[in-house]
């Protein structure tokens, strides 16, 4: 029988609920409890798959092919547990399910309303995660801020939820902000008091308060919050701004978040083993030589658009005892100027995924610069497609080569639409999504890095390498180091006579973990370090 923890947020958005939920998951797992975490998002989109990266940040893809909120990436990285499509719920998906049931006559002619039908569907989704995961504890993060109209059905649903189970099977955590007023030199509790008041008016009494602040909270403030918010003083948890998200579990452990949560759930506070995590944070805080990595992207104005890529680079640098010196490079600026202007001093180049024409020629120029100047390079998804186009144009004597996505009339579509995508009309959830196997080729860098015959990686794309050109690429020196088991789809490519030049059609960043960096990212950083050693 699962226990349930609900995490809400107050005062401001982007308060860090996802990191708190993920950190609690890490702390519970370190005590031997199994955990699954789900996100309730209050927007009307069915999923974030068709949303602009500028609006929503990256789309995180689960093993079973769900396009989800980036917080699921935090959940997976912190708990080292794979989530599924059940772990991502939006208002759009809830309404879609309820309306479909109404059309099928599932409500026997009744009037369909927010209460009880929408809230019941939300509760059923939470129960479904519990039954499918068999986890000891289900943590649910409610997106948005208490007081938002959009969040009301979710808050009502989690209020009702305590009637589905025993009261000691549920704990409510409210993450809030304690602003520091510089002119008066005071930390203010009033916004938190009002946020809790709003939550109580819905019928939810928080059991724990996690108080975000950039100043330490003294005992007097904790007593004040305890009195006004009806929370035990030991359950007022200080969450100071951290130097890294990976240090948050350690600070919340020190504050007693996990211990207090287990008390409300009437579960044993088992011995906590965070030795590996402490080592990770130590290495993060005590890095070695800086590695200048250029991330050449289309959406660099919003760093969250490439969140998993950045974290994968960070994991690799921690493992290799290097300092990640990340350089954000606009692909469009390279088009206006030159690759040399922005990339001349970097130690490694990463070209991540994306969609559409904008900035593609800048990415291609960056890849050419990496190839010709022997700079370690890693291409991801569109990054691989751009690497293929660059080679075709500049080495394989196909100067008019392109992708049929970028130029439908190109005479040499070295990248083309997957055959199964040709009749697809809807955009949402229709790409090649989720985990697929890839067979690695012997005597390749890819095979050496993975040390496996078959790997499983997550995908999110419609376009692939055009096998019509495979032989001409092989003849001109390209190496295909990974394909689908039937050999039909090219998944991983590389070059000889280069320190490190690999590109993959999949998204390895989704499988990188703190303490377990992905082989392709680890290889990139290691190669960069070797280059630096040789040049010195």
UniProtKB/Swiss-Prot annotation:
GO cellular component: cytosol
Residues annotated to bind L-glutamine: 354, 382-385, 405, 462
Pathway(s) the chain acts in: Pyrimidine metabolism; CTP biosynthesis via de novo pathway; CTP from UDP: step 2/2
Catalytic activity reported: UTP + L-glutamine + ATP + H2O = CTP + L-glutamate + ADP + phosphate + 2 H(+); L-glutamine + H2O = L-glutamate + NH4(+); UTP + NH4(+) + ATP = CTP + ADP + phosphate + 2 H(+)
Active site: 381, 507, 509
E.C. numbers: 6.3.4.2
Keywords noted in UniProt: ATP-binding, Glutamine amidotransferase, Ligase, Magnesium, Metal-binding, Nucleotide-binding, Pyrimidine biosynthesis
Chain positions recorded as UTP binding sites: 13, 188-193, 224
Record flagged with keyword Ligase: yes
Region (Amidoligase domain): 1-267
Regulation: Allosterically activated by GTP, when glutamine is the substrate; GTP has no effect on the reaction when ammonia is the substrate. The allosteric effector GTP functions by stabilizing the protein conformation that binds the tetrahedral intermediate(s) formed during glutamine hydrolysis. Inhibited by the product CTP, via allosteric rather than competitive inhibition.
Job description of the protein: Catalyzes the ATP-dependent amination of UTP to CTP with either L-glutamine or ammonia as the source of nitrogen. Regulates intracellular CTP levels through interactions with the four ribonucleotide triphosphates.
UniProt-listed HAMAP family: PyrG
Stated name of the protein: CTP synthase
High-level lineage: Bacteria, Bacillati, Cyanobacteriota, Cyanophyceae, Synechococcales
Encoding gene (name): pyrG
């Amino acid at each position: 029988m699962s226990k349930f923890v609900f995490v809400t947020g107050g005062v401001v958005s982007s308060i860090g609920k996802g990191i708190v939920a993920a950190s609690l998951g890490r702390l519970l797992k370190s005590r031997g409890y199994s955990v699954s975490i789900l996100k309730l998002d209050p927007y009307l989109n069915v999923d974030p798959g068709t949303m602009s990266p500028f609006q929503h940040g990256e789309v995180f893809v689960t093993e079973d092919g769900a396009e989800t909120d980036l917080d699921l990436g935090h959940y997976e990285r912190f708990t080292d547990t794979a989530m599924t499509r059940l772990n991502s719920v939006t208002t759009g998906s809830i309404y879609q399910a309820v309306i479909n049931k109404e059309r099928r006559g599932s409500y026997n002619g009744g009037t369909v309303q927010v209460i009880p039908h929408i809230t019941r569907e939300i509760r059923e989704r939470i129960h479904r995660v519990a039954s499918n995961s068999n986890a000891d504890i289900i943590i649910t993060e409610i997106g948005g801020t208490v007081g938002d109209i959009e969040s009301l059905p979710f808050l009502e649903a989690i209020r009702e939820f305590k009637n589905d189970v025993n009261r000691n099977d549920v704990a409510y955590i409210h993450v809030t902000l304690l602003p520091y007023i510089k002119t008066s030199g005071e930390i203010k509790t009033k916004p938190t008091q009002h946020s809790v008041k709003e939550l109580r008016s819905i019928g939810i009494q928080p059991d724990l308060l996690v108080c975000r602040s950039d100043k330490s909270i003294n005992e007097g403030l904790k007593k004040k919050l305890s009195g006004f918010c009806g929370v035990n003083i030991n359950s007022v948890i200080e969450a100071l701004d951290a130097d890294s998200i990976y240090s948050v579990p350690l600070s919340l452990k020190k504050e007693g978040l996990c211990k207090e949560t287990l008390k409300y759930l009437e579960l044993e506070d088992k011995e906590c083993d965070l030795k590996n995590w402490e080592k990770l944070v130590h290495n993060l805080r005590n890095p070695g030589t800086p590695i200048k990595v250029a991330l050449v992207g289309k959406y660099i104005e919003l760093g969250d658009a490439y969140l998993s890529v950045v974290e994968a680079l960070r994991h690799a640098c921690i493992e290799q005892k290097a300092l990640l010196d990340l350089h954000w490079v606009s692909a469009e600026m390279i088009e206006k100027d030159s690759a040399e202007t922005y990339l001349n001093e970097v130690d490694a180049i990463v070209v991540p995924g994306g969609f559409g024409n904008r900035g593609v020629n800048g990415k291609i120029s960056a890849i050419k610069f990496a190839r010709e100047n022997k700079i370690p390079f890693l291409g991801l998804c569109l990054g691989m497609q751009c690497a293929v186009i660059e080679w075709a144009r500049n080495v394989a004597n196909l100067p008019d080569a392109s992708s049929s996505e970028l130029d439908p009339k190109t005479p040499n579509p070295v990248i083309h639409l997957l055959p199964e995508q040709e009749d697809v009309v809807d955009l949402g959830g229709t790409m090649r999504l989720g985990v697929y196997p890839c067979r690695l080729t012997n005597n390749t860098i890819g095979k050496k890095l993975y040390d496996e015959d078959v790997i499983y990686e997550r995908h999110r794309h419609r376009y692939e390498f055009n096998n019509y050109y495979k032989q001409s690429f092989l003849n001109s020196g390209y190496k295909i180091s990974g394909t689908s088991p039937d050999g039909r789809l090219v998944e991983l490519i590389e070059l000889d006579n280069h320190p490190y030049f690999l590109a993959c059609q999949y998204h390895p960043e989704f499988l990188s973990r703190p303490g377990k960096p992905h082989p392709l990212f680890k290889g990139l950083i290691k190669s960069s370090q070797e280059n630096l050693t040789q040049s010195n």
